[in-house]
Amino acid sequence: MVQIKQEFIEEMVAHAKADLPNECCGMLAGPDGKVMKVYRMSNVEASPFRFVMDPGELVQVDTEAGENGWELLAISHSHTGSEAYPSDTDVRIAGGTAGLWPDVRYVLVALMDMDDPSVRIFAITNDVVTEEPLEVV
């Protein structure tokens, strides 16, 4: 189970709103399933339908997380007009990242209802999507 502070949820929602009309993306890192930092990443695709993280930023995040003894807990991104559930594209991309980060989770921020955004977390393994509890503290 991933544990995250409410302020980090609010930070991810603010990032999603700021990047409209495009999807935003980021990484969550910390020890023992506890998010210590949310990394706001650049979506070099600049698209409302998909995201591609800046490779240089990925290296920086991976380096900083390693220096702090943290693991990369989750990849986050927003859905600008659909629910907080992995799309077929999300599932396909997750299959490609499994070799790099086999235990990484996927956090989705949905802005279908701008007044009540939805934030959910999933495991995606062998094309199977499983929602997991996200403990907000």
Model feature map: region roles:
Residues 1-72, 83-137:
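Conserved beta-strand-loop surface patch within small alpha/beta domains used
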